[in-house]
A protein has these predicted regions:
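Phosphate/diphosphate-binding loops
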Residues: 2
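A conserved structural/catalytic subdomain of Rossmann-like adenosyl-cofactor enzymes
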Residues: 5-181
Length: 181
């Protein structure tokens, strides 16, 4: 295998060429970290939040028509700082954010952080987002992890973007263009 050990964020994303782009990106980037100013300068949307820098990198790395699934803190959807607003705007304008899976706290062992999984395709603006709030009916944790049964309803419903008690459609036309939430 071709394994390169480096800090992806240290690369200026303007240097990414068409030949570097990928069809699929699946990621659970670190969040809560803070990057130094010299790293932030590699990105058009300057922020110290590691996960937001990775999200910019993923968008840039995708080919047109490329797909991404990325885990990120749920606060990304509502934070009002400049970087969060600008990144949501970029995501909604450059990609079709077709699905948001809202996971329960504790879905990832060792952290109680609430997360969402963003599923998007690069190359066309978002019109509608199917939002699914996963309710497993129990506390999650190391001895009670997320399992296939917990995910079964989501997997079935996402095939048709079914509307249920746990899922709904958000029309991007109703999104506040000042905050992009």
């Amino acid at each position: 295998p071709n394994i390169i050990h480096s800090n992806t964020l240290a690369e200026n994303i303007t240097d990414i060429q068409e030949s570097d782009r990928k069809d699929v990106v699946l990621a659970n980037p670190p969040f809560g970290g803070k990057e130094q100013t010299q790293i932030q300068q590699n990105f058009p949307i300057s922020t110290g939040e590691t996960a937001y820098l990775f999200l910019q990198h993923f968008i840039k790395m995708l080919k047109v028509g490329g797909r991404c699934g990325v885990v990120i803190k749920n606060t990304f959807l509502s934070n009002t700082d400049n970087a969060s607003v600008a990144l949501r705007k970029q995501l909604l304008e450059e990609c079709s954010l077709h699905t948001i899976l809202d996971l329960p706290g504790g879905a990832f062992t060792g952290t109680g952080v609430k997360t969402v999984v963003l599923f998007f395709e690069k190359g066309r603006a978002t019109e509608k987002v199917w939002y699914y709030q996963l309710d497993v009916g129990r506390n999650m944790g190391k001895t009670n992890p997320l399992n296939d049964k917990d995910m079964a309803d989501f997997i079935e419903c996402q095939k048709t973007s079914a509307l249920t008690d746990n899922s709904w459609i958000v029309d991007v036309g109703t999104v506040n263009k000042d905050t992009w939430d």
